[in-house]
Amino acid sequence: MGIDKRKDDHIYLASSELSQIGSAWFEEVVLIHNALPEIDLSEVDLTTRFLGAPVKAPFGIGAMTGGTELAGKINAELAKAAEEFGIPIYVGSQRIALVKPEVKWTFEVVKQNAPHVPKVANLGAPQLAELGERELEEWVVQAIDMIDAYAIAIHLNAAQEVVQPEGEPRFKGVLEKLKIVKRAAGKPLIVKETGNGISKEVAARLSGIADAIDVGGFGGTSFVAIEGARAKESPLQKRLAETYKWWGIPTAASICEVKSAYAGYLIASGGIRSGLDGAKAIALGANFFTMSQPLLKAALDGRLREEIAMIIAELKTAMFLTGARTVQELALVPRVYGPRLRNWIEQRRLTC
C-alpha cells in the first residue's frame, strides 16, 4: 500500500472512536476547589512561553497529518486556527514530503497560514536509524525550511512500527542520531512519543540532548489500534495489534515519570480531551499540553475554532476555580491522586 493511502487511512481512523483506547488517568487527578479564589475570571492570564517563544496559552495543536490533498486542506485549517488563537502547531511526519517533493505543499500551507506562531517540524526515529549523517542533516534542514519551523520533533513510535504492515522497527543508534539532529537543526529539539508514553529511564537518557520531552502517553488515540484496523491482509500484524493496543504508560503517570528524571521543558499529550485535562497535566508538572484527535475531528466537522475556544475556556475556568492567576500558579495548586496513580508513583518512586 502506498504511503499516501496510508496517510488518509490514518486521518479517518484517528478521527473515529475505534482509535480511542484506554484511559490517560486524568480521572485519577482531582484539583482542589478553591471556594475563595480572590481573583476575577477576567484576571486569569493564560499567556506563557513555548520553549522561549511567547504564546497566548499553554496549549497547542499536536502532530497530525500531511502528504495528501485531504491532509493539506486539514493542515491549512489547523494553521489558520493556530495563527488566530496565537498557539503553536506541530505538523505530522514530513518523511512523505522528503521522498515525494510534489506533496511538500501539504506542509508548506502551515507556514503560509500561520506565519507568526511557533511551528514544529516532525521526523520519525526509524528514519534517523536508517540515514547516514549527511543525509540526515539534509533531511533535518529541509523539514525545518518546509514550514519555517521554530523547533523540530523526533517521534518515537516503536509499538506502531512493530504492528504496522509497512512498519520499520529499527531503533538501533537513535540516541546518537538525536545528537546529529540537534546539531543540524540549530533549533529546539523535542523528543516525543506517539501514544505509549515515556518512562523516567528514557527521560534520563534524553537529558542533555532533548530541549523538551513530549510524553505522548497512553490513553487516547492508539496508533497500534489504527494499524490493527489497517492490517486486513496480515493476520500476524492484526493479532499483534490486538494484543498490544493496551500497552503503554498512561499520560498522567508518564508526566510524573519524566518530571522525576528530567529538568527540561515538559510537554503533555495523549488522551487530553478538555481544558480541564490540560490543567491537570500542568498541575502534575507539564509546562505545556497539546491535543490532536479532538481537533482533527473538529476540523473534519467544520467546528475547529469553536472547539479551540471551548478548550481555552475550560482551561481558564480550571485556573479560576483553583485560584491560579497564571500558568505558573496553576503548577502549584493542591491536588489529590486516585489509587492507581498514587500506587504507580509509590512503586516507581516518582516525584509528582
UniProtKB/Swiss-Prot annotation:
Which species is this UniProt entry from?
Pyrobaculum aerophilum (strain ATCC 51768 / DSM 7523 / JCM 9630 / CIP 104966 / NBRC 100827 / IM2)
| Record-given protein name | Isopentenyl-diphosphate delta-isomerase
Q: Where does FMN bind?
A: A63, M64, T65, S93, N122, K192, T221, G271, I272, R273, S292, Q293
**Catalytic activity of the protein:** isopentenyl diphosphate = dimethylallyl diphosphate
Q: Which parts of the sequence bind substrate? A: R6, K7, S93, Q94, R95, Q160
List the GO cellular component terms: cytoplasm
What does the UniProt function comment say about this protein? Involved in the biosynthesis of isoprenoids. Catalyzes the 1,3-allylic rearrangement of the homoallylic substrate isopentenyl (IPP) to its allylic isomer, dimethylallyl diphosphate (DMAPP).
Keywords for this protein: Cytoplasm, Flavoprotein, FMN, Isomerase, Isoprene biosynthesis, Magnesium, Metal-binding, NADP
A GO BP term here is:
isoprenoid biosynthetic process
- A Pfam family of this chain: FMN_dh
* Family per record: Belongs to the IPP isomerase type 2 family.
Q: Does the keyword Glycosyltransferase apply?
A: no
Q: NCBIfam families per the record?
A: IPP_isom_2
Name where it's found.
Answer: Cytoplasm
Q: Does the keyword 4Fe-4S apply?
A: no
Q: Which InterPro entries match?
A: Aldolase_TIM (IPR013785), FMN-dep_DH (IPR000262), IPdP_isomerase (IPR011179)
Q: Which gene encodes it?
A: fni
Binding-site residues, Mg(2+): E161
